[in-house]
UniProtKB/Swiss-Prot annotation:
This is Putative ATP-dependent RNA helicase YLR419W. Residues 430-531 form the RWD domain. The modification Phosphoserine is found at S9, S816. Residues 45-57, 551-566 have a biased composition (Polar residues). It catalyses: ATP + H2O = ADP + phosphate + H(+). It comes from Saccharomyces cerevisiae (strain ATCC 204508 / S288c). Probable ATP-binding RNA helicase. Its EC number is 3.6.4.13. ATP binds at G627, E628, T629, G630, S631, G632, K633, S634. Residues 365-406 form the UBA domain. Residues 845-1020 form the Helicase C-terminal domain. Residues 1-57, 226-251, 543-566 are annotated as: Disordered.
Length: 1435
């Protein structure tokens, strides 16, 4: 029988008793209690339900029943209630939930009290109820919400209890932001699971605390010898006292800190012991510690580092070591590098979790463990001792000798006189006998022919142990100076000092080959006490000056600058050549061909202004010439100038004309057209210079070039503009290079002899340029366009009587339709409706306008073409499909036009299609770049897509918006080139006049500015911000500051004085469009990937993939690339392109192009670019002048080593790095046991550097340095931002893309693939990306998997997290990326990177091929080989 509980006794719920009859036993109950009649019982139940629900009509379940069923489903125990009577107020109950663990049989309980109850006020949501049953049901509702607030159970509750549920929901949401931890504890969907996890966490903490206490006890046991006079102290106690004393001085918190959970989930990396020793040995030889000291100029810096000193003492470094470290720029790195592992404070000790070594010392055989323990007495770690033992075939003697030699690698043994084993043993034993006789009783533990020990200081238990090595005495013996007593300890840093000075003594005395042990013992007896009393600095002055004489920077720089300037020195033409040119010109102007071309030129409107233009240019230094489209200004103005120079001045060589164009196609086209008009071959009198092609010669008078080329030329030789008329065309486009050229020209105007500036544009803000150039002279050329009739949206809607279905009117606002004359099914939208003013496109209306214009032209017997302007490729494809479906194919030839099409497809728009109306559906490419001669009508949606840069998160976003009035005018002008035209605008006249901006936003205000900053800096301009503030439109200051910070992060700008670093100077020498590409070229040469890096940069330089465009090919292209999926997007494209260039046969090449969907034009552009890059690299001296592809094997030694290629790509594109976060491991049960499951692609997360966090961090650092105000670290945003792989990537592998994301992406990029496969990125901790794209999410494109060591060696700055309390968790890259590793690994990699920078400088300033080089590059080569070995070791 169930035990009665308190609430059962107080419950007023009736019991269904069975009525009794005479002669039968009465039913159980209280004495004398009569059974209730059935009707009374039912009435009482109804009364109770009414009380609980506050209504007599409720027929659903009651809260207690719902709670009971919920607990039953979760396999919890029966719910119990703790009932309390609150005086006369009534009853309050608390539901008590419980769960019994089926394994341990332990029962866990959870009391579900009122979470809103406030002890101070004694008030809460639950008030005392009249009866116990009401109180019990109220407690059930409270418990239900607390364990199931995320469900819809409230829909099953009575109305009054539903109100309680809602009140609890409001309470939880209101307090969630302010006290998330407490709220999550109160409202827990599975409180018993949380209890178990809390127990485990508590147990783990207790275990760590016990381990910490045990470690502290161990440290206090060994007494450290600090003086030869018997000064012995407990190292643990000594450190602890210093910690307490120093803690008071440390009050500045570290800005960069991460919680324990973040460190637990961070990437782990370790160096194997051989790599660690390789790096350390190399660094000991090369580090110039003198250069790392704080100079006298920086005394103020030294004075402001008291907080840092206090922090180092708090970390328990010895005071004398801290004093020495404070002399250096990076004291912590100095200490971590120079202190032996054993003497590092406990905070930096190596834990078991800090290593990936497969061989654990504790798992070794006992004999091996004992050898390792003996070898550590030299002053090395167990790992170092084990590695030495393994490298010497487990021979203890040879391992001891090896470790001794490593202390002073420069000490050379006399290997020219090898000693036989017999001679070595004989010499060893003779010396032992002599020592025994001289120092009686001092020799002990002698093992025949192997080793022995000598007593040095009896009082301190210090002894000398020597090991015989083969070839002794011609080689060093193994030398150990130690206590050999676990109760006494000689600090390792003192051991290191003793042995270092001892070996220097042997080296200086040239004693190797003599009786070494005798000399060693004698020297130690005399000097060891002095060294123990005064060990001296960790770095003696003699060692700190080791690398000073190796530097010779100025000569190298001078030679590079000289070589780079040779190309751009201005050549003079001889008198003989001038005579030939004069004679050739005289003949040419008399030819019939020239005269016929003259007649063609005279038909252009510009011809009438020839004299005015020449006169205004002669009289003014700066001229602005505006002209309508088709006026001939681009082809004629430069010819007017040249004709005047040749005819009037007889100038055939002195004055040059440079004409810049914003696009390559324009520069080439104009050069060829002007050459034809002047009846010369392109490249002679008239030529062009674009990236990759220089089609000019010394006698060329008119040079067309892209604005970017002129910017790069001006970086190296401004004198090239002497006696030059610079014509800057299309200034209205306001590209970043055009704005920079205009600003530079203004600065150079009075500094360069004989230079004039001519600005040209179709539509431009004349007042802006007059303000920028005081005294600017202007001239306007009228065009020859025909009258154009304009129709705005209100006219179109009226003429077409356009209607929409009533159900579609929801897309428009309430007042946007004209209700007059509307029938029940259709409505008439107005031009000022929200739909149209927001820029949305009604494709039904667009198609009807095309049909309407076609019929109107047909009625006028006009066979001209129609251009439809749309914002993007997705919109063009949609419109083309609709037009093809709705129209009669016999009437229309619908042609798309955008930059992604092949040149062949683009050329289709120029053809005539007899009997059909040509309808060109285009982006703004048809606005200026391409002219369709037979166009008579334009239909303009008034929309365009432009890239906008957001410096806050360092991303660019493709934004669709209304175009400017100037662009509307340009589009309109396309309709009046051949006859009277029509211009239909799908926007209202009011929107055009009042909402559209006058001119387009300059590019300098909407793109990243790193390349601009570097270009300006390379010209010798110190204050870039001040210089650019004088531009036509100053760039946004936040974008400029972001550019400066990014260039500092990637190592091109020095953080202290904002000057170009060595690497920055090298990259600025190369006229490369992007600093990332410049870094890739330099790294490629140094690491033996020259040809492949040049090809990669050429592919990246074209800006798009080298495939035939179009959405119909997207999946085919991805399928081709997926053959190389494991290497990522860039290498997949590289392999396909490289295979093409390997083919020699032309027919096979053509087939390869077709099979792999490669664009012939883009491949040719890549080929042209590679030639240009080789020319640049030769010119600046990075490659020999006679270099041919693949001709020097060392420059291509790693061309098939994708590990090295990945690493240099990482260095080139940092900080474009994303961390790959895998989900928690899941296991699958099989017959052979549990097997780890591959993670689902949709569960993998990608994190990139948060630019908002970096900006805020800089702001806080400034505030702290200025001590202006306190900073709240809680306000710092998260260091990382989540990103997603773009579906076009070969690494994208999921079928879980939600429909909304897929729709948004398809609007920009077309349909996406939804195939699923095991993701490659699982194998790599990071991926690098070249570009990113923001739609509804941040997507990463062109991905390449990469490794942790690649990131550490080539990525951002490395710092140490010293904010922990027990142990250093690891290092932090660039303030945002925590990496778990032993601190010593961090400092070794950090110093190796410094040596790598030095190696880059040496190799580039004095290349190996330079025969006259006097600089020894062997050290640089060794550094590069070490880096290559480290990268290979991670695989």
């Amino acid at each position: 029988m169930a035990k009665k509980t308190k609430n059962n006794s107080k419950s007023s719920t009736p019991v269904n008793d069975v009525p009794t009859t005479a002669g039968k036993k009465k039913a159980k109950g209280k004495k004398g209690q009569e059974p209730e009649p059935e009707d009374d019982k039912r009435a009482k139940q109804q009364s109770n339900r009414a009380k609980v629900t506050s209504t007599a009509s409720w027929t659903g379940k009651l809260p207690h029943t719902i709670l009971h069923e919920t607990c039953q489903k979760r396999k919890w125990n029966k719910v119990e209630y703790d009932m309390k009577k609150i005086g006369d107020k009534g009853f309050i109950a608390i539901a008590v939930l419980s769960f019994t663990d089926p394994k341990t049989k332990e029962t866990l309980t959870a009391r579900m009290n009122d979470p809103t109850y406030d002890k101070a006020s004694g008030k809460g949501l639950v008030i005392p109820q009249e009866t116990p049953i009401e109180a019990r049901h109220m407690a059930s509702t409270i418990a239900l919400y607390r364990i199931a607030y995320n469900t819809n159970l409230h829909m099953m509750l009575p109305p009054n209890h539903r109100k309680t549920w809602y009140a609890l929901d409001d309470f939880r949401k209101d307090n969630l932001k302010t006290d998330e931890k407490r709220i999550n504890k109160l409202f827990d969907l599975d409180p018993f699971k949380t209890m178990v996890e809390d127990r485990k966490l508590k147990a783990q903490r207790e275990k760590e605390q016990v381990a910490q206490n045990n470690q502290a006890q161990k440290e206090q046991v060994a007494r450290t010898i600090l003086s030869s006079h018997g000064g012995i102290s407990s190292s643990g106690k000594d450190r602890q006292e210093r910690k307490v004393a120093s803690h008071k001085n440390s009050h500045n918190p570290s800005l960069v800190r991460f919680p324990k959970k973040v460190w637990e989930n961070s990437i782990f990396v370790d160096l194997d012991e051989s790599s660690r020793q390789l790096i350390e040995t190399s660094l000991k030889e090369k580090i110039d510690w003198q250069a790392k000291k704080i100079s006298h100029k920086n005394e103020t810096i030294a004075e402001n580092r008291e907080d840092l000193k206090a922090k180092l003492l708090t970390l328990q470094f010895r005071p004398k070591h801290v004093e020495e470290a404070m002399l250096y720029k990076d004291p912590l790195s100095f200490l971590l590098f120079n202190l032996p592992e054993d003497d590092l404070p406990p905070f930096f000790h190596k834990k078991k979790g800090d290593t990936k070594n497969k061989v654990e010392i504790t798992n070794l055989p006992l004999s091996t463990r004992m050898i390792v323990e003996r070898l550590t007495e030299i002053g090395v770690s167990s790992d170092e001792a084990l590695l030495a033992l393994q490298q010497n075939d487990m021979n203890e003697n040879e391992a001891a000798g090896f470790l001794t030699r490593e202390i002073l690698p420069t000490l050379n043994s006399n290997t020219n006189e090898p000693v036989s084993e017999t001679e070595s043993i004989e010499c060893w034993n003779q010396e032992l006998e002599s020592l025994e006789s001289i120092y009686e009783g001092c020799v002990m533990d002698a093992k025949e022919d192997s080793h022995y020990t000598l007593n040095l200081i009896e009082k301190l238990k210090i002894k000398l142990k020597v090991y015989r090595t083969k070839n002794y005495p011609a080689s060093l013996p193994g030398i150990v100076v130690s206590t050999f007593d676990k109760n006494y300890k000689l600090p390792d840093y003192i051991k290191k000092q003793i042995l270092t000075r001892l070996l220097h003594y042997l080296q200086e005395g040239n004693l190797i080959g003599d009786m070494l042990v005798y000399h060693i013992y004698e020297w130690l007896k005399e000097n060891i006490s002095k060294i123990i009393d005064n060990p001296g600095p960790l770095i003696p002055d003699s060692d700190s000056k080791g690398a000073i004489n190796k530097r010779n920077i100025s000569n190298g720089k001078r030679s590079i600058n000289n070589s780079s300037s040779r190309k751009f020195t201005k050549t003079t033409i001889s008198e003989d050549t001038l005579s030939v040119l004069r004679e050739e010109y005289t003949k040419r102007i008399k030819s019939s061909e020239y005269k016929s071309m003259q007649l063609v030129r005279e038909q252009l409107p510009a011809w009438k202004k020839q004299k005015v233009i020449i006169d205004i240019i002669n009289k003014n230094e700066v001229v602005l010439i505006t002209g309508e489209t088709g006026s001939g200004k681009s082809t004629q103005v430069v010819q007017f100038i040249l004709d005047f120079l040749q005819k009037e001045k007889g100038d055939f060589g002195k004055t040059k004309i440079v004409c810049t164009q914003p696009r390559r196609i324009s520069a080439i086209g104009l050069a060829e057209r002007v050459s034809d008009e002047r009846c010369v071959t392109c490249g002679e009198e008239v030529g062009y210079v674009i990236r990759g092609v220089n089609k000019t010669k010394a006698s060329t008078r008119i040079k067309f070039m892209t604005t970017g080329v002129l910017v790069r030329l001006l970086q190296n030789a401004r004198t090239m503009l002497e006696n030059t008329i610079v014509v800057i065309d299309e200034v209205h486009e306001r590209s970043i290079d055009t704005d920079l050229i205009v600003t530079l020209m203004k600065n150079l105007l009075h500094r360069v002899r004989g230079m004039k500036i001519v600005l040209m544009s179709a539509t431009v803000n004349v007042d802006l340029f007059k303000k920028f150039f005081p005294g600017l002279a202007t001239c306007h050329i009228e065009g020859r366009t025909f009258p154009i009739t304009d129709y705005f949206l209100e006219d179109i809607l009226s003429d077409l009587d356009f209607k929409i279905k009533r159900e579609k009117a929801l897309s428009y606002d309430d007042d946007s339709v004209d209700e007059r004359n509307n029938d029940d099914q259709y409505l008439k939208p107005r031009a000022d409706s929200k739909f149209f003013t927001s820029g949305q496109i009604n494709y039904d209306l667009l198609c009807q306008v095309v049909e309407y214009v076609h019929k109107r032209l047909k009625a006028a017997n006009d066979n001209g073409s129609i251009i439809v302007f749309l914002p993007g490729v997705g919109e063009i494809n949609k419109c083309c499909n609709l037009l093809a479906n709705k129209s009669n194919e016999a009437d229309f030839m619908v042609l798309p036009l955008h930059s992604a099409l092949t040149p062949e497809d683009q050329k289709r728009v120029f053809k005539k299609y007899h009997g059909k109306r040509k309808v060109v559906v285009s982006t703004n490419i048809a606005e200026t770049s391409i002219t369709i001669d037979d166009c008579v009508a334009t239909i303009d949606t008034g929309r365009a897509k432009s890239m906008f840069y957001n410096p806050k998160d360092n991303t660019t976003k493709l934004i669709e918006s209304f175009i400017s009035k100037a662009e509307v005018k340009q589009r309109r002008g396309r309709a009046g080139r051949v006859r009277e035209g029509l211009s239909y605008k799908l926007f209202s006249k009011n929107l055009y006049e009042n909402d559209m901006i006058s001119m387009p936003i300059p590019e300098i205000k909407r793109i990243p500015l790193e390349s601009l900053y570097l270009s300006v800096k390379a010209m010798g301009i110190k204050d870039v911000k001040a210089f650019l503030s004088t531009a036509l439109d100053a760039p946004p200051l936040p974008a400029l500051q972001k550019a400066e910070r990014i260039l500092t992060t990637i190592g091109l700008v020095d953080e202290s004085d904002k000057s170009l670093t060595q690497l920055g100077q090298f990259i600025s020498l190369m006229p490369v469009m992007d600093s990332k590409h410049g870094k890739l070229l330099i790294y490629g040469i140094l690491f033996g990937c020259t040809d492949i890096s040049v090809l990669l940069v050429s592919i990246l330089g074209i800006g798009v993939l080298p495939f035939i465009g179009g959405f119909e090919n997207r999946e085919k292209i991805k399928k081709l690339l997926c053959k190389y999926e494991s290497r990522g997007d860039l290498f997949a494209v590289l392999e396909i392109v490289r295979d093409y260039f390997k083919i020699k046969d032309s027919s096979i090449k053509r087939k390869y192009l077709r099979d792999n969907l490669l664009s012939y034009n883009k491949i040719n552009e890549i080929k042209s670019s590679t030639a240009q890059y080789y020319s640049i690299l030769k010119d600046v001296g990075f490659l020999p002048m006679d270099y041919k592809v693949g001709s020097i094997s060392d420059l291509n030694r790693n061309e098939r080593n994708f590990d090295i290629l990945r690493a240099i790509l990482t260095g080139a594109f940092y900080p474009h790095i994303a961390r790959v976060q895998l989900p928690d491991v899941k296991y699958l049960s099989t017959s052979s046991g549990a097997v780890e499951k591959d993670p689902e692609a949709k569960m993998i997360k990608y994190w990139i550097r948060s630019e908002e966090y970096q900006d805020k961090l800089e702001e806080y650092k400034t505030k702290i340095s200025q001590e202006t105000q306190k900073v709240d670290l809680e306000d710092l945003p998260l260091p990382a931002t989540r990103a997603f792989i773009h579906p076009s990537s070969v690494l994208f592998s999921t079928n879980s893309v939600n429909l909304e994301d897929a729709k948004l992406l398809s609007e920009v990029d077309g349909p996406i693939s939804r195939q699923s496969k095991i993701p490659t990125v699982v194998k790599y901790p990071f991926v690098l990306f070249t570009t990113s794209q923001v739609t509804n999410k941040l997507y990463l494109r062109d991905l390449t998997p990469t490794t942790t060591l690649s990131l550490l060696l080539f990525g951002g700055a490395i710092s140490y997290d010293i904010g922990g309390t027990i142990h250093s968790p690891g290092i932090v890259v660039d303030n945002w990326l925590p990496i778990r590793t032993w601190c010593k690994n961090g400092v070794l990699i950090k110093e190796l990177r410094t040596q790598l920078d030095e190696a880059i400088r040496k190799k580039l300033e004095s290349p190996d091929y330079a025969k006259k080089s006097q600089i020894d590059n062997s050290g640089a080569d060794k550094t590069l080989k070490i880096v290559e070995k480290i990268i290979a070791s991670e695989q």
